[in-house]
C-alpha cells in the first residue's frame, strides 16, 4: 500500500467520522435552541406561596411554589392546577398570568424546569419531560391535595410537555404509556404543533434534525378521555394559531377550542380580557369534574 493510498484512506475515515459526529450532535444543538432559561427574579415570591424543592426521577433538584386556595383548606379546593410554563424565563415571570386561580377556590402548583430559575441542571427534551412527570407525581402525593382532582395547564412549550407526560407517542417505535391517574382536565394555551414544524418555520428543512416523539401532534389523541381545552390568540407572533386548529382536529372528544380575536402569545389569562377567558377555563374545569 502506497503512502498516497494510506493518506486517502485516513482522509476518508476522518470525513466519515465528522459526518457521524454531526449526525449525532446536530439534533441536540437544534433542540437546545428552543430553551431560553434564566434565573432573573421577575417579582417577589407570592406571600401565600410555599417554596418547594422536589426531586426529578433522575435526581435533579427542582424548585416550585404551592399556592393554596384562598378559601378554606387546600384538600377541599375545587381542583389543583399544575402550571407548566414555556421555553423562556421562569415561574416568577409567569406568575401574573395565573395569580388569579387561588381566588377561584383552586390550588396552584408552579415549578421551574431544570436549568430555569432556582432549579438545577441543564434543559433537554427528556429532562423537561422528566420534570413535568415529577411535578405531577409530587402534587399527586401531597397530603393536602385531593389526588383525584388534578388539572394540567400547559402554556406554549409547556403544552407539549403536558401531552407527552400523560399520553403516549402515536407512531413511535417504543410507545410511552403514562400515568393519567387523577388528571381530570388539560388546558393548552398557545401550544405549537411539533418541534419540527417550529424549526422549519425558522430555518426551512431544519425540522428533520429534531425528535418529534415529545411533540403535541404525536400525543394529543392519546390523552383521551381526559377533556382538553385549547386556547390560542389569532395574532400570536410566536406560534401560529393554525397550530392549535390542527391540534384540535387531532384531539379526541371531549374537547373544546377558543380562538381569541387579535390575541397574542399566552395572553388569554392576562388582564387584557378581564375575566372572559378565565371564566371559560373555570367553567371547563367544573364541567370536566362533574363528568364522573
Swiss-Prot record:
Pfam families: Hydrolase_4. It comes from the Bacteria. SUPFAM superfamilies: alpha/beta-Hydrolases (SSF53474). It is found in: Membrane. The chain crosses the membrane at residues 13-35. InterPro entries: AB_hydrolase_fold, Hydrolase_4. Keywords: Membrane, Transmembrane, Transmembrane helix. It is a single-pass membrane protein. Its main location: membrane. One of its GO terms (cellular component) is membrane. Belongs to the serine esterase family. This is Uncharacterized protein YfhR. It comes from Salmonella typhimurium (strain LT2 / SGSC1412 / ATCC 700720). The lineage of its organism: Bacteria, Pseudomonadati, Pseudomonadota, Gammaproteobacteria, Enterobacterales.
